[in-house]
Every structure is written in structure tokens, then in C-alpha cells.
Amino acid sequence: MNFFQAIILAIAQGVSELFPISSVAHSVIIPYLFGWKLSPFFLKTNFLEFVVMMHIGTTISLIVYFRKDWKKMLKSLFNKKTSKRNLALIVIGTIPAIILGAIFEQTITNAFSDVIVASIFLIFNGLLLFFGEQTKKRGNKSIEDLKGWQALVIGCFQSLALIPGFSRSGSSITAGFWMGLSNEESARFSMLLSTPMVAGAATLEIPKLIKNHVPGLLSLSLIGGIVAGLAAFLSIYILMHWFNHKKNNTMLPFAIYCIVIGIGVLASKAI
């Protein structure tokens, strides 16, 4: 992997991890479009340090952007403020992904990390976003209004991201719509849910990283982490402002993008 490939992959990671367009699908599709031999399995086997640093960069951006939320929630552990309830809802929402990820992630990744399969599920992701937009409740609930079972449902939808092509944020934002959250609160809850998941993904790989450190990869990995972090921060800023100011058809552009890219890649494979 060269410098140019590292920059492109880092930007793609930072943007697609938080935009509802599936980071895993893009990690499969982008190397295919550029003609690179860099599958997710290859990256995890040979460039694990780079992958971990991209996740760390994204995690730092999430924490920095939502630092006020996390500060309130951590302080709430020592009092009876509403923020304690928000923290509990986030914990509940992460349970499905932790359980299902521990059981099925490796199997699913090995089975579905294929350009054709990723493109098919990217189309399904677009259809989910479109259907979610058309059927959302136009709610005005805030995060603290959620019941425990509703947070669990949103967490279950987030688990769809284990399948390459489905977006973690797209699935959880759509579920948030169905649970009656407002546009901005649905996006906020999705981002807050993403933080422990992305951080956990990096943490789980650290023991492998220590064992299989590749000499000379540190500088490329640091650059990848910084670029992914900056791209992620900008993506969060754009996404939150988008959901705050636009009340209708919020998911439609992302749905169209996923469907068009998925169909385009499938068509290129068929030619």
C-alpha cells in the first residue's frame, strides 16, 4: 500500500463510517474501482496497524465533537441527572452489536467481503434508507424520551452493519425515526452509539497488532489515522447540520447514492 492509497482509504473510512453509506462496503468497492489488490481481509492481515489507527482517529473525532454529551453523561454517574439515563440507553443500544459481533462478525466478514455481495447489500442499504424516510413518524422525541426496549431495537438495527453494505449509522438513524426521535436526535443517538462500537473495534485488534507489528508502517498508519479523524470530524459536522436544518427527505440523497453506486458496480462486473 502506497501513500496515495492510504490517503484515499483514510478519507473513505472517515466519511463512510459516519455517513449512512457503509464503510465496509466502501473498503471493498474502492480498491476494486481503482484496481488495487487491497481487500478488507488483506488489510487486516497485512496492514492491521493502519486499520486500527483509522478507527482510533474516527473515535477521537466522535469524542471531541460530542464531548459535551459525554462529559454530562460521565458526570451523571455521580448524581441523578437525566444524562445518566442517556448513558444507560447507549449501553442498552450497544448490547446487540456486542453479542452478535462476538459470535458472527468474523464469519460474516469472511463470507461477504466480496465486491458483488457488498454492492448488493449497499443497494439494500439504500432501499432501507428510502423506506425509512417514507415511513418515519416525523417525531419530536429526544434521546431521554426513549424507552429501554426502543434503544435495544435501535441497537439491533445497528447490528446490520456486520453485513458489508449495510451502514451502522444509516440503520440506527432509520430505527430512530421509527421510534419517534426527531431528525437531529436520531442522528445524535446514532453517533453516540457509534463511539463505543468504533472504539471497541480498534481495542479488540490491539493484541493482534502488538503480536504482528509490521516495521516501517507506523508513519503511514499515523497519517491514515489523522486523515480519517479529520474526515470523520467534518462528516459529523455536515451530518448533524444537515439533520438539524433539513426536516424532510433527509435520507433520500444517501439512499440514491447507495443504490446508484451498487448498481453501477454490479453493471461493471457484468460487462
Curated annotation (Swiss-Prot):
It is found in: Cell membrane. Keywords: Antibiotic resistance, Cell membrane, Cell shape, Cell wall biogenesis/degradation, Hydrolase, Membrane, Peptidoglycan synthesis, Transmembrane, Transmembrane helix. Its main location: membrane. One of its GO terms (molecular function) is undecaprenyl-diphosphatase activity. It is a multi-pass membrane protein. It holds the Pfam family BacA. The chain crosses the membrane at residues 1-21, 46-66, 88-108, 111-131, 146-166, 190-210, 220-240, 251-271. It catalyses: di-trans,octa-cis-undecaprenyl diphosphate + H2O = di-trans,octa-cis-undecaprenyl phosphate + phosphate + H(+). The keyword Transmembrane helix applies. The keyword Heme does not apply. GO terms for cellular component: plasma membrane. InterPro entries: UppP. It comes from the Bacteria. GO terms for biological process: cell wall organization; peptidoglycan biosynthetic process; regulation of cell shape; response to antibiotic. Its EC number is 3.6.1.27. PANTHER family: UNDECAPRENYL-DIPHOSPHATASE. Belongs to the UppP family. Bacitracin is thought to be involved in the inhibition of peptidoglycan synthesis by sequestering undecaprenyl diphosphate, thereby reducing the pool of lipid carrier available. Catalyzes the dephosphorylation of undecaprenyl diphosphate (UPP). Confers resistance to bacitracin. This is Undecaprenyl-diphosphatase 2. It comes from Oenococcus oeni (strain ATCC BAA-331 / PSU-1). The gene is uppP2.
